Regions:
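Positively charged, small/polar-rich N-terminal and surface patches that mediate targeting and assembly
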Residues: 1-93
Length: 93
């Protein structure tokens, strides 16, 4: 799962294309706040920024490359915000 400020949408889409990651589910207008840094993204008058969240299932050999690409985006845009989370998928239907 990748959660990111909507301002990073083009960068995230480009990253997925470059890594040949085609399938995903996208949620828009995702509210939240980081655990230690950054401002809340609540879509309100006081905190107007808002996130998107993207869920994709990728092969094991793509996980590290995906995480490295997310980290690269974050390093360039630390104040904007992007995070990636990894779970093991045991089975799918």
């Amino acid at each position: 799962m990748i959660v990111y400020n909507q301002a990073l949408t083009e960068k995230v889409e480009y990253m997925l294309d470059k890594l040949s990651i085609r399938g995903y589910t996208l949620w828009e207008n995702v509210q939240g706040r980081g655990t230690s840094t950054g401002v809340p993204h609540l879509g309100t008058h006081v905190w107007p920024e808002i996130n998107k969240s993207l869920l994709t299932v990728v092969e094991d050999d793509k996980v590290d490359r995906l995480l490295e690409a997310v980290k690269k985006i974050d390093n360039i845009n630390e104040e904007v915000g992007i995070r990636a989370f990894v779970w093991d998928v045991i089975k799918t239907v």
